[in-house]
């Protein structure tokens, strides 16, 4: 498969006791399919790194534990300032990045596989400027800056593209406060971080699942509007006679 689509030269590199082959190849991309099953909403977060509109929760507890432990270790190593401490610091940082990337790869693969199985597109939040918008306690701010929302979103998008699954981005505004059952929006709908209870209709759900359902609903509405506009701009075939 590599020889059929290989482009340019390949490099064999020995690093950290392992051999790595770096090769560039062209991969034919399928055309995005029409999401006949609607959209699969995905809410990205900190406590739970990804939650879907189907109710699947990908907890970030282990990843966050690793990051908090490494943050304490980095602080001690930085205070030492020795050459050996700096070497260990680089090693710890590299190990953490690889662990986070592996976690994001596994989560993104699960999400894309489920969307493909159910013939749905994938709906994500437009996370531009999230670091400026989100108000969090200091420990969460540290986690937010150290964990890359963009990386998981990128992994989902490119895996979906390779599978021919359309991905759409929606405005994330008030998705955490809006009821996915009746549409009522209020800050009081969130009695705590993990729970959503609508003060209007009484609908109760895991807060992240509720947000993911709102994301999916916005994607369905946006897709319908954009494709209706596309259909309206298509030229009408000329009639004969």
Label the model's feature ranges.
Residues 142-143, 147-241:
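Positively charged, low-complexity nucleic-acid-binding target-recognition regions
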Residues 4-11, 185-186:
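Short small/polar-residue motifs
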Residues 7, 14-153, 224-241:
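Substrate-contacting helices/loops that form the catalytic groove of nucleic-acid
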Residues 1:
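Beta-strand/loop nucleic-acid-binding surfaces
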């Amino acid at each position: 498969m590599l020889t059929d689509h290989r482009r340019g030269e390949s490099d064999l590199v020995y690093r950290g006791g392992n051999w790595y082959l770096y090769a560039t190849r062209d991969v034919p991309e399928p055309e995005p399919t029409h999401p006949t099953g609607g959209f699969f909403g995905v809410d990205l977060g900190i406590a739970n790194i990804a939650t879907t509109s189907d109710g699947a929760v990908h907890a970030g507890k282990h990843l966050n534990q690793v990051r908090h432990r490494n943050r304490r270790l980095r602080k001690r190593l930085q205070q030492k300032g020795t050459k050996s401490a700096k070497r260990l610091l680089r090693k710890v940082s590299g190990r953490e990045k690889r662990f986070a990337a592996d976690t994001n790869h596994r989560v993104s693969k699960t999400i894309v596989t489920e969307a493909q199985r159910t013939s749905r597109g994938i709906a994500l939040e437009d996370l531009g400027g999230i670091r400026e918008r989100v108000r969090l306690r200091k420990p969460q701010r540290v986690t937010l800056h150290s964990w890359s929302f963009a990386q998981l979103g990128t992994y989902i998008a490119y895996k979906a593209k390779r599978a021919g699954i359309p991905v759409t981005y929606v405005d994330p505004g008030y998705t955490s406060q809006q009821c996915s059952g009746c549409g009522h929006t209020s800050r009081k709908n969130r009695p705590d971080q993990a729970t959503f209870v609508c003060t209007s209709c009484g609908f109760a759900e895991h807060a992240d699942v509720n947000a993911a359902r709102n994301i999916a609903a916005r994607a369905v509405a946006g897709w319908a509007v954009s494709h209706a506009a596309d259909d309206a701009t298509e030229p009408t075939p000329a009639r004969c006679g």
